[in-house]
Structures are given as C-alpha cells and as structure tokens.
Amino acid sequence: MKKHLITGLFAALALSASAQSFKEWLDPEVNAVNRAPMHTNYFAYESADVATRGLKEQSSRFMTLNGIWKFFWVKDADARPTDFWRVGYNDKGWNDIPVPGVWELNGFGDPIYVNIGYAWRNQFQNNPPQVPVENNHVGSYRREITVPADWKNKDIIAHFGSVTSNMYLWVNGRYVGYSEDSKLEAEFDLTPYLKPGQKNLIAFQVFRWCDGTYLEDQDFFRYSGVGRDCYLYARDKKRIQDIRVTPDLDADYRNGSLRVQLDVKGGGNVSLELLDAAGKQVATAAAKGSGTALINVENPHKWTAETPYLYTLRATLQGSSEVIPVKVGFRKIELKGEQILVNGHPVLFKGANRHEMDPDGGYVISRERMLQDIQVMKQFNLNAVRTCHYPDNNLWYDLCDQYGIYVVAEANIESHGMGYGEQTLAKRDDYRKAHLERNQRNVQRSFNHPSIIFWSLGNEAGYGPNFEAAYDWVKAEDPSRACQYEQAGKTGKTDIYCPMYYGYEGCRKYCEDASMTKPLIQCEYAHAMGNSEGGFKEYWDLVRKYPKYQGGFIWDFVDQSPRWTGKNGKMIYAYGGDFNRFDASDVNFCDNGLISPDRVPNPHMYEVGRIYQDIWTTPADLENGEKIG
C-alpha cells in the first residue's frame, strides 16, 4: 500500500509539472491560463459597518501577500530553476525581496531607459513573438502563508496587482495558471489548491521579457517584478460576481439615473441602496439575479472636476452577508457637434501625461505619492490626466474620482519599436487577440469610475484591423463614453482627433476647416524637457478662440529618474546611461517632466500653471475707470 501511495504521489507531481507547457511566454495567442475573468474594481465586505469604512485591509475577508518573499534571480532565461515550486524545495540560500518591489531597485540587474525601441535592441533583432533568452532575467518567488481557518467554506481568490512581464503560478506544488499584461491585475481562484488553517506554499516565476513585451514599448524606465499590491480575498459561494454602474442625466441635465448591471453567481435577489456623501439614503431598488436595475434620482449633485461629488451605491445579495460599496458620480458625457460636453457644457482639458514612476519604488507608487501628484495638479490648474500608456493602479482612479481629475484611461498597448508600416502589430493576426483583450480588460476593470471620460486604445502602435476591432468592441460595450486613438488620425476609428505635437499652424487650419468635425484634443503636446514650454500661450490662444479645440495633455508630468548612488558615492537622479555601457539607452530623455522626481515643480511648470488658469481678467477701459471684466 505504501509503495502505491508513493507511486501515486510522484504521478500527481508529474501531472502538475506537465500541466503548463512553458511555451506560453512565446505564444501571443495565449495570454492567460486559468486567470479569472476581469470584473469591475470593488471589494465585498462582510457587513455594512465594515463597508462604510471602505478599507479592505480592515476586512476579515482580506489577507495581504505584501511583504518579504524568498527570491532567486538569474540573468538568462534558460538558467531559471524549473522545480522551485515543489513543497520540499530548499530555498535557504535564496535572497529576500519585498512584494511589491521591482528587481532593479532592489539589487537585481540594472534599470533600462529607452524611448523608442525595445530594451533588447543592442543584442537582438525584433522577431515577434520571439524574445531573447540571453539577458532575459527571470525571478522566482516562494512564500509560506497560513490562510484563516474560517475561510474554509469560502472561495479564495488571489489578486496580483501588476507583474512585469508575466507570471506562472503554483500553490502547494500544483500548477495554477499563467498571465500576461503587466499593468492590469491577474486574479486566480485558489479554492481547489489552498488548505485553510494550515501552511500553504505560494510560488511564482516572472520573466523580464515575453511575447507580450512587444506591446509594452512605452517611453519609460523598464523595470521587472511586482509593481502593485498582492493579496488574497474570500468570497461567498453565492455572490455578486460583477457590478457595473452607468450614470446619466436627462435632456435638461437636471435629473439623474443609474443603470446598474449585475452578474450574480448562484442567483438570488439583490437589494440596492444609494447613499449621499453624508450617508443619508437617497434611493433604493431591487434586481432579480443577473440583469439590470434602474435608479432614478431627482436633481442629484453633479460630478465634474470642479465639483467631484460622490454617492455610494451599496449592493447586497439576499442570503449573503456580503456588502459591495461602489462610488458613483452623476455626470453625462456627450459628443455634440464639434465638442465634448460634460453635463451639457464644453470642457477645456488642461492635461498632462503621467507615468506611474517613483524615484525610490519605480513602478511601486504609494498612496501618499499619488495624493502629492493630485495636489500638484490642482495647485497648477491641471484638470485632466492621461494614464500613459497603460492602466494605472486602481487607487489612482479612486483619488481622481474623489478630488476631481478628468481621466483618459489608456490600454496597455504600445509597439512603437515595430514602426507604423506593414510590420506593425496592429495588422498581425497573431496579435489580434492581445490588442482586443487588453482593451476589454481595461474597460471591464475601470468601468465604474466617473472620472474616466474617454477610453484610449493605446499609444504609438500603428493602425490596422486590430485597433478597429478594439474600437468597435469598446463602443458597443460602453456607448456612454468617447473613445480615442492617436494613430487613427482624422478619418479612422476615433471619436476625437487626438494628434501629438501638432504645430500651431496645423491646429489653426484644422479649427478653420469646416469639414473637420471631430474635437481637437492633443494627446501629447508642449514637450516639457529642459528650458521648455515656449509657445504654450499661443497654443492656448487658439484653444480659447476655436470651440472645437479643447486642449491637450502635456508630455509629461514627472521626471522619471530613479534615486541612485553615483560613482562618487553621492545621491543622484540617474539617467538611462548611468548604469552600464552595454544595455540600450536613450540617456537623459527620461526627464521631460513638469515636476522633478521628488515632485518639486520645474521652472516651466509655473508657465503652465498660469496659462492653464481658469479665471482671466482684461481691462475694459482703464482711462475712464471702467471695471476689469
């Protein structure tokens, strides 16, 4: 009998080891294995009282995976350990690394900064979906955790907020799944793998580059590892799986409505309660299982960047203790004539492009840093941000909802290094799924944020049928918002003409051309490197003269340099060329910001703050003492 048990154990281990092909990282048509479907960003609390506090970390249904993990780093992908996920594997000689944390700022490899082109450009010729093996660093992670015993009858979900460039996951020696798309969360149902009340081994492996890296050629420092929070959470077996809220206003922009779409696992009635900012009940509704409910509200407070009033919608499934709070704002986005309207009024978008970049954490951005960024934006009259060029941390959208920042929410697509011609990935069938999936997941996850006014399909990735398919899907899925893409130009599938670095004369001619009916909002302009922002006033003279010209997004908000120890032992903010002589580098082009890495305004930020100001006065007749108006 003992021999049979041992034989069965080895057979089970062999089955687990062979469940993944290890070809996923080079297959553009396999972007996930066993990854849970994307849903809107919410947390299901165990009671209304805990839900009111709105801090998932205080919930008994939450368990953080942040902290110190055992870590093993190799320079080349073919040197990676292949059995490290086994329960009895000896990791005593491994290093420690924080999660979240990027490798290069924790002593493993050097940061790479390139603008156009891939980080491997000095060693490897582009050949999608193939990526290098040499210098393709791989990090392997292990950690033992004890899952709460009272989660035994729950479904247990793992949330990995952002992992670059991919991840393979094992639990207790069993293969769970795989995920790509570095800037959106990967969730996995771990219920069949975990043992509540006991120690459990979680192991995952991350490659610096995979086939998806061809879609992540953004102009920023290239780091690897875990960039956002990771945690487990417990759900009832019978539950609200997804909840989407679409606000609207009537033709007079007075009365409001909320269209609530529900996906319920296991069926049952859902009660909906709308609370104002003071916690007072405003309206209620009910829904039978999966479907749609409509909530009408007479003359609600309206959400704008100037008046970011938020209500709370609470959803509870009958027979379940779970309470899901969703922040909602009543606002209406319209494309009328040649303008974008918010609540019936044209808006001037005084924006900037913002990379998620911290001088000490790289991709790891604290709440305090995000609040600092919003404070600076408000101080200098910015009212809009483009999430260049990928979805941001969920918390960033929450804060934009709360403090009032219009958001252009961009999908994680840029393939600039492949060019815009026939070789563009936008025209390749094998990358069609990835283009579509990254846009779908972006919309599915961030749907409920009132601050999001446009979806953006990506950046500098050519144009072709893959983007046309993505546009069609986004517009069908969410007709309440505009959708833009720069490479679609004036006549392609984009609701907004959103060029980059369009000159003064080009802007003027577009505004005076009656055949051009799309709003003009530059997705990038006024490049803020060095002694810059000359001519910015002239741009805004046009914006304030021509109704169809509604502003733009400066490149870019913050200098990207990491804090580094220089050769003389002193602290520096490092450029792309400061680390070694063999990696690709576009040197100091990483610092194009309105503010420095530590968020001190650069001199040209003061010029921007003045031109972006909301209130302008002009003397009517000083000689006769007329009032300034």
What is the meaning of each model-derived region?
Residues 160, 258-266, 344, 628:
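Aromatic/hydrophobic beta-strand junction motif of beta-rich domains
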Residues 20-57, 108, 124, 211-214, ...:
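Extended substrate-binding grooves/exosites of carbohydrate-active enzymes
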Residues 195-197, 263-334:
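Extended acidic/polar, glycine-enriched regions
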Residues 176-177, 282, 347:
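Short hydrophobic beta-strand segments in globular cytosolic domains
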